[in-house]
Amino acid sequence: MSHNSFGHLFRVTTWGESHGPSLGCVVDGCPPGIRFTLAEVQHWMDKRKPGQSRFVTQRREDDIVKVLSGVMLDEDGETMTTTGTPISMLIENTDQRSKDYGEIARRFRPGHADFTYDLKYGIRDYRGGGRSSARETAARVAAGAIARKVVPSLNVRGALVQIGKHKINRDNWDWDQVDQNPFFCPDPEMVPVWEEYLDGIRKSGSSIGAVVEVVAEGVPAGIGAPIYAKLDQDIASSLMSINAVKGVEIGEGFASAELSGEENADQMRMGNDGKPIFLSNHAGGILGGIATGEPVIARFAIKPTSSILTERLSIDTDGNNVDVRTKGRHDPCVGIRAVPIGEAMIACTVADHYLRDRGQTGRLK
């Protein structure tokens, strides 16, 4: 199985499976001299880790990160400085229960990668989905923690903006609320609605989809490239690589089809400081594949978790018609924990483009 790496200069390779002894990543191309602490990496890991509320999988993983290479420890015993060599990070699996998946060893879960993995490779890891499990994304979040340090002033924040048909009221958007509830929800009025709704979904043994929005501020103007290396192209690609993601939009996205040219165009003026300013940001911070300096805004849609308790029609590896009901511990809405994953992927993509731009133009933005 190939294609386990992404990025060009800031290149991330992830490895490991959902029910293996461990998983991790190798970050290649990180510049020397980047300083960080394990606590800073762990902060982002803790946002993603399972078992933190009744609305996510009850699998209990501490997701403690170990840095194995690519750094030197400072005299304070906490701060690490990158040396420019590959940074390898490891996360141990401690709460896998493979016996829960015995009944689907030869059965394909509808909506899951079971069928296509078996079709392509002739073998699949049915224990939690192997590489197709969202467990793999823990390694991406670890890599994203390093990426955030590469670009000066970069601030990447995400929020859940829709669960099922229930959307937030954008007039109530408050970033301070995002870490105050189990949904990463910026609208405090929507929290009790989602709680009641997801309790019903969870008790029925079903699942539901969601939409995540990520905003990256401090993205240097001018990074990116035209045609085949657009910043928005690579952001879309990175987000689409996340498990269960079925759609991505940048800026106004699909809603721009409803706008006129006058409404959609981001008008400009010169500011009092002699720098250009945009009067709107329908483009989501990117024009012609190149960052404008405005916040980069992306949204991605996540399908409902395929592993559900409701019986569904399928087939087995012998070609028999069967009914499938998945046991085990699963997210009733995988979109909740996708928030820090989306943040990490955009951080890695911006870091990669930042280094590529620096190498091509020599500018330190």
Swiss-Prot record:
Entry's cofactor comment: Reduced FMN (FMNH(2)).
Organism domain of life: Bacteria
Keywords: Amino-acid biosynthesis, Aromatic amino acid biosynthesis, FAD, Flavoprotein, FMN, Lyase, NADP
This protein's pathway: Metabolic intermediate biosynthesis; chorismate biosynthesis; chorismate from D-erythrose 4-phosphate and phosphoenolpyruvate: step 7/7
Enzyme type, top EC level: lyase
GO CC annotations, alphabetized: cytosol
E.C. no: 4.2.3.5
Catalytic activity: 5-O-(1-carboxyvinyl)-3-phosphoshikimate = chorismate + phosphate
Reported cofactor(s): FMNH2
Molecular function GO terms recorded: chorismate synthase activity; FMN binding
Pfam families for this protein: Chorismate_synt
Positions contributing to NADP(+) binding: 48, 54
Record-listed FMN binding positions: 131-133, 243-244, 288, 303-307, 329
GO biological process terms held by the UniProt record: amino acid biosynthetic process; aromatic amino acid family biosynthetic process; chorismate biosynthetic process
Family to which this protein belongs: Belongs to the chorismate synthase family.
Function, in words: This reaction introduces a second double bond into the aromatic ring system.
Subunit structure: Homotetramer.
Official protein name in the record: Chorismate synthase
Protein species of origin: Agrobacterium fabrum (strain C58 / ATCC 33970) (Agrobacterium tumefaciens (strain C58))
Species classification: Bacteria, Pseudomonadati, Pseudomonadota, Alphaproteobacteria, Hyphomicrobiales
Gene giving rise to this polypeptide: aroC
